[in-house]
């Protein structure tokens, strides 16, 4: 019976199914028949596509947050709505495709797109818009039509959806998912999609297909990730080039789910909302899901989770158009509270508490609106606020990796945080949110992933200065880190450049880019493929020619392990000719540093050759601006056939000689590299060249475009239009390089004004990698390059220009009419904004401008081309002596100072200083050994001075300060080349300033009032050179003393351009040339002037200020053996105090021509006079007491310290100072503020010009307090292309000549410590992706450990969070030695003074003078200190900086300088603070230590005050201003604690409080400097 019922039931069921199928078939036939009849009746009739136009008029309110109406209109007519912002004002009112009829009662048919945009902008609060909406009577067909099928044939889809969509992971039983080659992809919106993939389907193909389906525009934020089944917090990224087949075939693949996620979180979600509302909504849904799944549970606080839940609930209410006052009971019953609150929170909190908290937060969220805003908060605002709250979590906006940092001699276990906000940062203190930036994405050139073992991999992050971050991680984490860095690089720097190449598939055929073939197909099931796709698609399979310098280097062999690229290169006729041999190698050789594949390592640094190679390629390829070729099959053979010839001549090739030069300059490096590279033929590039890595931009095999860094060929925007397809590529014949550089004028469209700086490759053979471990006091393994090496290397530099390109003219085609490089489509990767930025920071809106010096010379006198301002100040010492080895790295490598002694220095006087060199003092004040450094160094502040007096008594032994060749036509006195004018050795001169922008040299003119006269080399009366025409200026001394004071170590410690690590006056100046060369009979008041520049100086009589003399460390002998500088401290005799003058120190920039030198000198030109003298006295020595020759080096160091608010410690060790001893003799002050924007002839030998950058448009008045000086305190301003500011001196004040109340405004541009714009290259980097301000709120106790023995603390601090970055990108910025040095130097006119400029020096002078005059008793000292501190706080509250600007392209240089100075200054401040908390000292000693701390604080503030701004760094400087105020406030508390300790004695409580305040100050200083942490801090 039961069987009968069962059988009957099955029969009925089958019958019902048959009936249903029959009914469906019958309906299908009927509909098809009706369709045929309709088609026969009229072809236009189609019942399935009936369009019903409906007219709608809607009123849209402007979104107060986004300031827009939430929709976008088409640029073409008729005006239609193309997009509606999700959650915006127009959401639900307008729809894509609506045709606009009226906007604010204006008919749209008469409107252009521009006018429509204007109407939208002019509409204040609301917009009335009438649209026509075409609605279809029936749903769109999802079946493929013939039309769609035809489109798909021309535009094939690479990824196919499976036949069903899974909801929440549940399948309806379709067996398709059990078939092979199907990937289930889980979306964050709850959907699951199934993809059928092929053997060559990649991750990128899947992503692009999902992009179509979801209509996402900003796909660069997305990636595929594998989520572990049992640990949802572990997500592993997939590289876009990975094959899906390989991913699915992994053994552990069954334990993972594949997710489509926003893996690269934007810095500001508002940017994403404006850019792509769909992607923003996806990110919001993903974030909500992550919160509910507790991905951020480690960081998330309960209050934050509840607030997010309230926002989520409100967003749902608004999005679902629910009534505003909906009860939580309804939400809990209808929606479920578990959909908004994480399970852990539900378990741990009572339901009543949860409801109460959510109600509170929902009310609070209403306050997001402005008080007078009437409209309700929108869903978009709630979503935005939700994401902004989440953005405060480090694990949301970044990802933490535990890695082992591989240093040279040790390993360091660190926690890395990688994210858009943080770059690559090291987490120092997670609780206090203290991080140190190791690298920014914009500074990364390449990422490599190497498998060390089955479970461990190595990630190498190559930075622009050829520094490598080597990180050891677990294999999955290593891959995630590499993919994350590459993804953020694409997102933030260059969307078309992949810096992480997937090693698996190098021979892939051309792949469609993210935009190619998919851009317009936004509708579901690919049913709306655009016609543009059909047009573009045939080109996608067509190989596009790469634009690149195609030169045959060495015909290399394919190394094992690298898949060859000749097949790729030869696939078609468009390939660049030698791509299979040359181009790929060139791209790889130049790619920063591939030392592992190259097979050799330098002895002390793995990256020294890499620095040279990559810069050589940068320089060569960028210099040959028109060297592009259209590749053809014949070209490959022709170039290959020439390769043997090339091999023989490769040593002299212009393309390679830079590397040769650098290798010769470092013989040890050369020996190691060539011995380790067995495959090298003639040159050390073969292994590198044979390393073929397939750059994603180089799928077509034309790898040479890796380095088509055409010099200013075209804006990068010309390269970035991915929709423009140009199948042909145009090139130009290479310019010939003549003996003296480029002899042909380049087309203006092809070249910017030539960059006058030496090639970057001329760098120290020892890389910065040697300096990883400053705290460990490593010494560089090899001796620095000596002058002999440089001289041998120089012919190669000459041969570089002699050797023309080997490419024959027939292989090149003319360039485009405007010199523009044709853009490339997405498949052939284009360059876009960044043209492979490296250490030279070549990211500009234009392509790089790296060119060779215009005046190369094979003589030793021009060897200074090889000097590199930052790392190589000693490379070109002019004598075959050992050099001062490691004073060059300006970021502070203290241990490096102990390496080499100076060989040929003049006999050194035993120094009484027991302090280490300033670099040692900066970095490790009490832990460094100092003897070898001090004994072998030159004086920290050494003056070169020569007297110019009528009797020529003191000129015989004087060494002029810098070089100015007598043969140079623009020298002041061309004929003066007497025995006393020793030539300045090129070794002391550093590379050329970038500021030399071709301004024609002029004769310097001095103008005053109505009278003016010019200073030329042929001036019959050179005595007038330093005199004004005003007859009242009569205080000129007859024995004018011009002192050029070099402070190289000060410059170094300040992080400046290491002006002259070896001073100009050091050693016997065998090669010096006269800079300010007097005639054979020098005139009394002549200032040596370079006529190419402008000089204006007025001697002034000074009040007695107790000029201080100080001891010299050594003597300097000239080439004849005479004692030029007696370095003894002498007491002055015979001069009344009234004859004593104060000094004004002034920074002069000595620039040399075309790739020569720039040296910054500090010019101390003291001026006094005892008698009234006619304005232009010919020669009248009467009344002037000249110094004896032994006094010639009477230095002004103590005055410099006093006037610049620096104690001798801030310089290179303490100098003994006689505070009350005035200098003997009267010095005529000739402070020459000179400008020289142009250079002497291009072919001239070395010469120097003064080149300060900031300048005064007009003179300024100098109020006087001494009646004798009323008419003598004016100086003249010489007007020129670069307005130079002149300096005059005042009476009375040691630093200022006016009181603030008399002149509240001081010219902002009158800073003698000028900004050089000292550049070795043009550079512009992407805006620094910095970290947020330190989130320490109040207590800094846990930031650092308390006081410990100082040696341990110094070492620990330097290792854990070094105050000074261990390396830096090339810097140029403002080489200002000290803040506001010329506070008492003013120009003289009636222009109002700007308080902003001189308020700081005035304060410094007064505060420090008052402190020095304060009695030693504790109460008075602290009271005075408190007053000064309060004044400092007032200054910081009311003003900030001088307001000077620097060009954006030099922002990186200035940032490097700011960072270096801040790190050095903060280190000194913290070091002095540690002296205060010592237990074993008397109150008087403590107060002395406190005074030192205040002095260092003033110095630190001064460093911050002198920042210059641009659009890129102004925000960072504003933040630094706030942090500086925090430092001063914390310091105030520190001083109060110190005062309390002094008054109450050293009780435990007071000492603990003092130590705690010291710790707080340390953290505050750290917060100040953390924003300036170098992107290459390791």
UniProtKB/Swiss-Prot annotation:
PROSITE patterns: FERM_3, PDZ. GO terms for cellular component: cytoskeleton; cytosol; plasma membrane; protein-containing complex. Residues 181-496 form the FERM domain. Residues 822-831 have a biased composition (Basic residues). InterPro entries: Band_41_domain, FAK1-like_FERM_C, FERM/acyl-CoA-bd_prot_sf, FERM_2, FERM_central, FERM_domain, FRMPD1/3/4_FERM_C, PDZ. One of its GO terms (biological process) is protein transport. Residues 924-931 are annotated as: Important for interaction with GPSM2. It is a peripheral membrane protein. Coiled coil: none annotated. Pfam families: FERM_C_FAK1, FERM_M, PDZ. Its main location: cytoplasm. Residues 555-616, 720-743, 759-831, 950-1030, 1070-1194, 1347-1374 are annotated as: Disordered. Residues 1100-1117 have a biased composition (Basic and acidic residues). Keywords: Cell membrane, Cytoplasm, Membrane. Residues 57-135 form the PDZ domain. Residues 720-729, 793-811, 968-986, 1139-1150 have a biased composition (Polar residues). It comes from the Eukaryota. Residues 730-742 have a biased composition (Low complexity). It is found in: Cytoplasm, Cytosol; Cell membrane. CDD domains: FERM_B-lobe, FERM_C_FRMPD1_FRMPD3_FRMPD4, FERM_F1_FRMPD1, LGNbd_FRMPD1, PDZ_FRMPD1_3_4-like. Stabilizes membrane-bound GPSM1, and thereby promotes its interaction with GNAI1. Interacts with GPSM1. Interacts with GPSM2 (via TPR repeat region). This is FERM and PDZ domain-containing protein 1. It comes from Homo sapiens (Human). The lineage of its organism: Eukaryota, Metazoa, Chordata, Craniata, Vertebrata. The gene is FRMPD1.
């Amino acid at each position: 019976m039961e069987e009968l019922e069962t059988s009957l039931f099955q029969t009925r069921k089958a019958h019902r199914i048959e009936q249903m199928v029959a009914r469906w078939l019958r309906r299908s036939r009927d509909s098809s028949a009706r369709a045929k009849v309709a088609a026969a009746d009229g072809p236009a009739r189609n019942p399935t596509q009936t369009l019903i136009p409906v007219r709608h008029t809607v009123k849209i309110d402007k979104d107060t947050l986004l300031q827009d109406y939430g929709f976008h209109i088409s640029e073409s007519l008729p005006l239609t709505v193309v997009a509606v912002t999700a959650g915006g004002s127009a959401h639900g009112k307008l729809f894509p495709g609506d045709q606009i009829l009226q906007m604010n009662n204006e008919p749209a048919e008469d409107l252009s797109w521009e006018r429509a945009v204007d109407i939208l902008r002019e509409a204040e609060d609301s917009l009335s818009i009438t649209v026509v909406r075409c609605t279809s009577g029936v749903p769109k067909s999802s079946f493929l039509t013939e039309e769609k099928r035809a489109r798909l044939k021309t535009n094939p889809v690479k990824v196919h959806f499976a036949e069903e969509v899974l909801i929440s992971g549940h399948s309806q039983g379709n067996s398709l998912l059990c078939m092979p080659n199907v990937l289930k992809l889980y979306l964050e919106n709850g959907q699951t999609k199934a993809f059928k993939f092929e053997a060559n389907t990649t991750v990128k193909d899947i992503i692009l297909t999902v992009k179509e389906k979801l209509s996402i525009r900003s796909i660069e934020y997305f990636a595929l990730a594998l989520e572990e089944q049992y640990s949802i917090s572990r997500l592993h990224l997939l590289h876009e080039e990975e094959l899906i087949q390989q991913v699915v075939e992994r053994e552990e693949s069954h334990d993972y789910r594949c997710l489509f996620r926003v893996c690269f979180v934007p810095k500001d979600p508002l940017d994403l909302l404006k850019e792509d509302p769909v992607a923003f909504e996806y990110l919001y849904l993903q974030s909500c899901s992550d919160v509910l799944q507790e991905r951020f549970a480690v960081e998330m606080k309960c209050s934050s989770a509840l607030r997010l839940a309230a926002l989520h609930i409100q967003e749902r209410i608004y999005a679902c158009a629910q009534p505003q006052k909906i009860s939580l009971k309804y939400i809990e019953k209808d929606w479920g509270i578990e959909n908004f609150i994480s399970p852990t929170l539900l378990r741990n909190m009572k339901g009543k508490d949860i409801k109460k908290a959510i109600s509170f937060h929902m009310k609070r969220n209403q306050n997001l609106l402005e008080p007078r805003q009437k409209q309700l908060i929108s869903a978009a605002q709630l979503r935005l606020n939700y994401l902004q709250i989440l953005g405060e979590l480090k694990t949301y906006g970044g990802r933490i990796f535990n890695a082992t940092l591989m240093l040279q001699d040790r390993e360091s276990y660190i926690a890395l945080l990688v994210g858009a906000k943080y770059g690559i940062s090291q987490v120092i203190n997670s609780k206090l949110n203290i991080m140190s930036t190791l690298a920014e994405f914009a500074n990364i050139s390449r990422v490599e992933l190497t498998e060390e073992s089955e479970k461990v991999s190595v990630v190498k992050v190559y930075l622009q200065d050829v520094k490598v971050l080597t990180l050891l991680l677990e294999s999955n984490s290593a891959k995630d880190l590499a993919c994350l860095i590459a993804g953020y690089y694409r997102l933030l720097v260059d969307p078309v450049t992949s810096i992480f190449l997937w090693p698996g598939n190098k021979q892939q055929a051309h792949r469609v880019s993210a935009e190619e073939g998919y851009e317009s197909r936004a509708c579901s099931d690919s049913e709306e493929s655009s016609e543009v796709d059909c047009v573009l698609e045939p080109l996608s399979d067509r190989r596009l020619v790469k634009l690149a310098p195609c030169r045959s280097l060495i015909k290399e062999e394919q190394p094992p392990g690298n898949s060859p690229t000749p097949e790729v290169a030869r696939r078609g006729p468009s390939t660049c000719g030698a791509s299979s041999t040359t181009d790929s190698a060139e791209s790889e050789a130049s790619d920063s540093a591939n030392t592992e594949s190259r097979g050799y390592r330098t002895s002390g640094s793995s990256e020294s050759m890499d620095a040279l190679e990559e810069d050589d390629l940068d320089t060569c390829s960028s210099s040959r601006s028109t060297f592009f070729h259209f590749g053809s099959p014949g070209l490959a053979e022709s170039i290959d056939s020439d390769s043997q010839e090339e091999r023989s001549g490769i040593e002299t090739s212009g393309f390679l000689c830079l590397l040769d030069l650098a290798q010769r300059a470092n013989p040890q490096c050369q020996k190691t590299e060539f011995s380790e590279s067995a495959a090298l033929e003639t040159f050390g590039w073969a292994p590198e060249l044979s390393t073929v890595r397939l750059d994603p931009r180089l799928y077509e095999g034309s790898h040479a475009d890796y380095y088509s860094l055409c010099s200013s060929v075209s804006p990068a925007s010309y390269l970035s239009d991915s929709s423009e397809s140009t199948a042909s590529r145009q090139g130009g014949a290479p310019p010939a390089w003549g003996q003296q550089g480029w002899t042909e004028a380049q087309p203006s469209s092809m070249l910017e004004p030539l960059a006058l700086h030496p090639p970057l490759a001329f760098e120290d053979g020892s890389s910065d990698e040697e300096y990883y471990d400053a705290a460990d006091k490593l010494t560089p393994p090899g001796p620095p390059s000596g002058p002999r090496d440089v001289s041998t290397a120089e012919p190669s530099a000459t041969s570089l220009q002699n050797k023309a390109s080997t490419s024959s003219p027939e292989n090149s085609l003319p360039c485009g009419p405007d010199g523009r490089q044709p853009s490339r489509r997405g498949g052939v990767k284009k360059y876009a904004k960044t043209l492979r930025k490296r250490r030279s920071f070549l990211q500009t809106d234009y392509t790089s401008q790296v060119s060779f010096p215009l005046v190369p010379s094979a003589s030793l006198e021009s060897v200074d081309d090889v000097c590199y301002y930052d790392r190589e100040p000693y490379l070109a010492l002019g004598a075959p002596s050992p050099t001062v080895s490691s004073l060059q790295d300006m970021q502070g490598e203290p241990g490096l100072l102990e390496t080499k002694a100076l060989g040929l220095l003049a006999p050194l006087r035993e120094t009484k200083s027991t302090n280490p060199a300033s670099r040692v003092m900066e970095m490790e004040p009490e832990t460094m050994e100092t003897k070898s450094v001090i004994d072998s160094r030159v004086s920290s502040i050494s003056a070169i001075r020569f007297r110019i007096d009528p009797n020529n008594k003191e000129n015989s032994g004087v060494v002029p300060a810098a070089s100015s060749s007598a043969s140079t036509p623009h020298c002041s006195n061309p004929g003066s080349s007497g025995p006393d004018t020793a030539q300045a050795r090129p070794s002391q001169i550093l590379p050329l300033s970038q500021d030399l922008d071709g301004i024609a040299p002029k004769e310097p003119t001095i103008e005053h009032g109505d009278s003016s006269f010019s200073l030329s080399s042929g001036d019959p009366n050179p005595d007038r050179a330093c005199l004004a025409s005003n007859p009242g200026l009569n205080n000129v001394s007859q024995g004018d003393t011009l002192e050029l004071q070099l402070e190289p170590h000060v410059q170094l410690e300040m992080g400046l351009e290491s002006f002259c690590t070896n001073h100009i006056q050091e050693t016997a100046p065998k090669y010096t040339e006269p800079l300010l060369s007097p005639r054979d009979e020098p005139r009394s008041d002549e200032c040596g002037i370079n006529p190419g520049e402008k000089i204006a100086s007025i001697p002034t009589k000074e009040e007695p200020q107790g000029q201080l003399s100080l001891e010299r460390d050594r003597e300097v002998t000239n080439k004849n053996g005479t004692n030029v500088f007696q370095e003894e401290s002498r007491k002055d005799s015979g001069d009344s105090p009234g004859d004593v003058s104060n000094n004004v120190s002034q920074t002069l920039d000595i620039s040399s021509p075309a790739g020569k030198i720039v040296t910054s000198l500090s010019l101390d030109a003291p001026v006094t006079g005892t008698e009234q003298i006619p304005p232009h006295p010919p020669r009248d020595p009467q009344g002037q007491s000249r110094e004896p020759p032994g006094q010639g080096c009477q230095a002004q160091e103590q005055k410099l310290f006093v006037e610049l608010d620096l104690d001798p410690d801030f310089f290179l060790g303490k100098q003994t100072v006689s505070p009350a001893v005035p200098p003997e003799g009267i010095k005529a002050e000739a402070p020459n503020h000179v400008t020289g924007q142009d250079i002497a002839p291009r072919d001239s030998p070395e010469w120097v010009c003064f080149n300060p950058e900031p300048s005064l448009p007009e003179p300024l008045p100098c109020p006087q307090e001494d009646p004798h000086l009323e008419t003598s305190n004016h100086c003249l301003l010489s007007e020129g292309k670069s307005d130079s500011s002149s300096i005059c001196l005042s009476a009375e004040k040691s630093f200022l000549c006016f009181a603030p109340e008399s002149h509240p405004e001081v010219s902002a541009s009158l800073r003698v410590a000028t900004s050089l714009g000292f550049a070795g290259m043009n550079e512009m980097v992407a805006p620094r992706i910095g970290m947020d301000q330190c989130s320490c709120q109040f207590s800094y106790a846990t930031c650092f450990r308390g006081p410990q023995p100082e040696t341990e603390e110094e070492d620990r601090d330097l290792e854990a969070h070094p105050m000074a970055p261990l390396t830096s990108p090339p810097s140029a910025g403002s080489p200002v030695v000290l803040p506001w040095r010329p506070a008492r130097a003013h120009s003289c006119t009636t222009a109002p003074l700007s308080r902003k400029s001189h308020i700081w020096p005035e304060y410094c002078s007064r505060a420090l003078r008052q402190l020095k005059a304060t009695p030693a008793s504790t109460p008075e000292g602290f009271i005075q200190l408190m007053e000064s501190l309060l004044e400092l706080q007032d200054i910081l509250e009311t003003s900030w900086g001088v307001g000077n600007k620097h060009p954006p392209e030099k922002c990186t240089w200035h940032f490097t300088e700011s960072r270096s100075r801040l790190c050095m200054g903060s280190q000194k401040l913290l070091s002095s603070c540690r002296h205060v908390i010592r237990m074993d000292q008397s109150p008087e000693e403590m107060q002395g230590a406190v005074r030192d701390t205040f002095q260092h604080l003033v110095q630190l503030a001064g460093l911050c005050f002198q920042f210059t701004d641009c659009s890129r760094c102004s925000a960072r400087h504003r933040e630094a201003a706030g942090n500086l105020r925090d430092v001063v406030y914390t310091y105030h508390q520190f001083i109060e604690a110190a005062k309390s300790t002094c008054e109450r004695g050293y009780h435990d409580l007071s000492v603990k409080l003092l130590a705690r305040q010291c710790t707080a100050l340390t953290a505050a200083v750290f917060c100040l400097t953390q924003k300036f942490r170098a992107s290459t801090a390791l």
